[in-house]
UniProtKB/Swiss-Prot annotation:
EC top class, as a word: oxidoreductase
InterPro entries given in the database record: Ero1, ERO1-like_sf
Binding site for FAD: R179, T181, W192, S243, H246, R278, R291
One of the record's GO molecular function terms: thiol oxidase activity
Biological-process GO terms, alphabetical: protein folding in endoplasmic reticulum
Topology of this chain in the membrane: Peripheral membrane protein
Domain of life: Eukaryota
Species whose genome carries this gene: Danio rerio
Primary localization: endoplasmic reticulum
Family as reported in the entry's similarity comment: Belongs to the EROs family.
Protein name: ERO1-like protein alpha
Activity regulation behaviour: Enzyme activity is tightly regulated to prevent the accumulation of reactive oxygen species in the endoplasmic reticulum. Reversibly down-regulated by the formation of disulfide bonds between the active site Cys-86 and Cys-123, and between Cys-91 and Cys-96. Glutathione may be required to regulate its activity in the endoplasmic reticulum.
GO cellular component: endoplasmic reticulum membrane
Catalytic activity, EC: 1.8.4.-
Length: 489
C-alpha cells in the first residue's frame, strides 16, 4: 500500500509542466469526454484530482516514511547479456548513508510501537488458543513456509527485490527525482520494444504505430487499432496501462529537463518542444491524445486500488512507523484522509468487469496477465541508466501492487493481520508514489497551462504502504519491484 500511495503521489504531484503555445493546447483539447471501457470522463477526473487528491498526496510523500525507498539497483539483466552501464552523470543515483535513514525504517528492533506490539501479541495469543495442534516437526514447518512463500509469489503481479540483500540500499526519492538524464537512443528503445513487442499480447505481424525499430510499412496505425479493439477487454486494458505508464514517464522527462548548465548551476525546467514531440496530435500522427487518455485510465486503476485498500489501514494495529511517534500519528491520519477521499470518487473503475465469465477461462487469462506484467517488472533490471532503473522499478512495483489489490483471489477485508502485512510490504510504498506521480501528470493549472505528474506519486505511496515498514508486521515477506527512460516514438 505504501507503494500505491508513493506511486499515486508521484503521478499526481511531482512536476508542473507549463505548456504554453498552440501545440500544447492541441494536445489537451483532444483529451475530453468519456474514457474507453469506463463510465468516467476526463473532466471529472481533472476536477477531483486537482481539488481533492493532489494537496494531500503531495504533503504525504514529503514525509520520511514515503521519501525513503529500499531498492537493489545491481541485479543483472535476466533477458540478455549486456555489461554496459550508462556513463552519463545524471544517470547516477546517490544512496543514503546509514545515519540519514530513520531508525524505525531500517532496524527491525524499531518496527513496532508499544501499542502495536501489544495489539499483535493479543492477536497471537488468540490464535494459539484456537490452534488444534501447535506441535509441528521441522520438516513440516519448512514445508509450510515454502508453501506460503509459493502462495504469496503466485499471487503477485510483479517481481520484488530482496530487501535483506547486501546489495539493497535506501534511496531518498526527494534527492533523486525522476527527470531527464540523457539516456536515450537504441538502448532505451530496446527496453520499450521488449515491453511492447513481447509483453503486450501483440503478434509480431501487427505493427505498432511510430515504432522506430520497425521498417516503415506505410501503415498509419489503423491496422494496430483494429487489432487492439478486437482483443478481449482485459488484454486491451493491459496495453492501455503500459501506454499510460509510458506517457507518465515522458511527461516527467519533459517537465524536468536540463535546459542549461554551466560551472555554477544547472537549470531544470519545462521543455515544451519535448512535450509536443510526444503528445501533439499533429506531430504524432494522432497518437499523442491516445497516450494521454491512457494516462487517465491508469489513474483510475490506481485510484480504485487506494479506495479498496482502505479497510486494512483503518485497523488500529496498522502504523506508519519511523520511530518519530508524533509524526507517525500525523502521517497515518493524513493517509486515512487521503484514502477516504479516494473512496469518495463518484465514478470508480469497476474491476469486476474484468476476468468475468467462464471461471476456467478467466483464471487462465488472469494468470497470463499476471505473468506478463511480472516479465515487464523484470525488464527494469535491464535498464542501464540507474536513475531510470530506480524509477522504473518503483513504478512497475506500484502498478503491480494496484493490480494485486484489485484482482487478488484473497479479499482484503477477510485477511488476518499477518497476511495483511504481506500485502502492505514494499509494494504499498510504490503504489503511493505511482499514484502521486500520476496525479502530478494530471494536475494541470487551467487544464492546459500546467501539467503535473500524478500517477507516479500514487505509485510511490502504494509501494511504501506495502513495504516492510508496517508496524504490525510480525512475519512479513518482502515485496518490491516500477519505468522511466527515453521514449519510443
Amino acid at each position: 500500500m505504501e507503494t500505491c500511495v508513493l506511486l499515486l503521489g508521484l503521478f499526481l504531484t511531482s512536476v508542473h509542466v507549463t505548456t504554453a503555445g498552440s501545440a500544447a493546447h492541441r494536445c489537451f483539447c483532444q483529451v475530453t469526454g468519456t474514457l474507453d471501457d469506463c463510465a468516467c470522463d476526463v473532466e471529472t477526473i481533472d476536477k477531483f484530482n486537482n481539488k481533492d487528491i493532489f494537496p494531500k498526496l503531495q504533503k504525504l510523500l514529503s514525509s520520511d516514511y514515503f521519501r525513503f525507498y529500499k531498492v537493489n539497483l545491481n541485479n543483472g539483466c535476466p533477458f540478455w547479456t549486456d555489461h554496459s552501464q550508462c556513463g552519463l552523470k545524471y544517470c547516477a543515483v546517490k544512496p543514503c548513508s546509514p545515519d540519514e535513514v530513520p531508525e524505525g525504517l531500517k532496524s527491525s528492533s524499531y518496527k513496532y510501537s508499544e501499542k502495536a506490539s501489544h495489539d499483535t501479541e493479543e492477536c497471537e495469543k488468540a490464535e494459539k488458543l484456537g490452534a488444534v495442534n501447535g506441535s509441528l516437526s521441522d520438516e513440516t514447518r519448512q514445508a509450510l513456509e515454502e508453501w506460503k512463500k509459493y502462495d504469496d509469489e503466485s499471487d503477485r503481479f510483479c517481481m520484488l527485490d530482496d530487501e535483506d540483500s547486501p546489495e539493497s540500499q535506501y534511496v531518498d526519492l526527494l534527492l533523486n527525482p525522476e527527470r531527464f538524464t540523457g539516456y536515450k537512443g537504441a538502448e532505451a528503445w530496446r527496453i520499450w520494444n521488449s515491453i511492447y513487442e513481447e509483453n503486450c499480447f501483440k503478434p509480431y505481424s501487427v505493427n505498432r504505430p511510430l515504432n522506430p525499430l520497425a521498417s516503415n510499412s506505410g501503415d498509419d496505425g489503423q491496422g494496430f487499432y483494429r487489432w487492439l479493439e478486437g482483443l478481449c477487454v482485459e488484454k486491451r486494458a493491459f496495453f492501455r496501462l503500459i501506454s499510460g505508464l509510458h506517457a507518465s514517464i515522458n511527461i516527467h522527462l519533459s517537465a524536468r529537463y536540463l535546459l542549461d548548465e554551466n560551472w555554477f548551476e544547472m537549470k531544470w525546467g519545462h521543455n515544451v518542444s519535448e512535450f509536443q514531440q510526444r503528445f501533439d496530435e499533429d506531430l504524432t500522427k494522432g497518437e499523442g491524445p491516445k497516450r494521454l487518455r491512457n494516462l487517465y485510465f491508469l489513474y483510475l486503476i490506481e485510484l480504485r486500488a487506494l479506495a479498496k485498500i482502505l479497510p486494512y489501514f483503518e485497523r488500529s494495529t496498522f502504523q506508519l512507523y519511523t520511530g518519530q511517534d508524533t509524526q507517525d500519528d500525523q502521517n497515518k491520519k493524513l493517509l486515512l484522509e487521503l484514502l477516504h477521499v479516494a473512496k469518495s470518487f463518484p465514478l470508480h473503475f469497476d474491476e469486476t468487469a474484468l476476468f468475468a465469465g467462464n471461471n476456467k477461462e478467466a483464471m487462465k487469462l488472469k494468470e497470463d496477465f499476471k505473468l506478463t506484467f511480472k516479465n515487464i517488472s523484470r525488464i527494469m533490471d535491464c535498464v542501464e541508466c540507474f536513475k531510470c532503473r530506480l524509477w522504473g522499478k518503483l513504478q512497475t512495483q506500484g502498478l503491480g501492487t494496484a493490480l494485486k489489490i484489485l484482482f487478488s483471489e484473497r479479499q482484503i477485508e477477510a485477511m488476518p493481520n499477518k497476511q495483511h502485512q504481506s500485502i502492505i510490504s514494499a509494494q504499498s510504498a510504490g503504489n503511493c508514489v505511482f499514484v502521486q506521480r500520476f496525479r502530478k501528470n494530471l494536475h494541470k493549472c487551467q487544464r492546459v497551462e500546467e501539467l503535473q505528474i500524478v500517477v507516479v506519486e500514487t505509485q510511490t505511496v502504494t509501494v511504501k504502504m506495502f513495504q516492510e515498514r508496517a508496524t504490525v508486521q510480525t512475519d512479513m515477506h518482502k515485496h518490491m519491484t516500477f519505468p522511466m527512460f527515453g521514449y519510443i516514438q
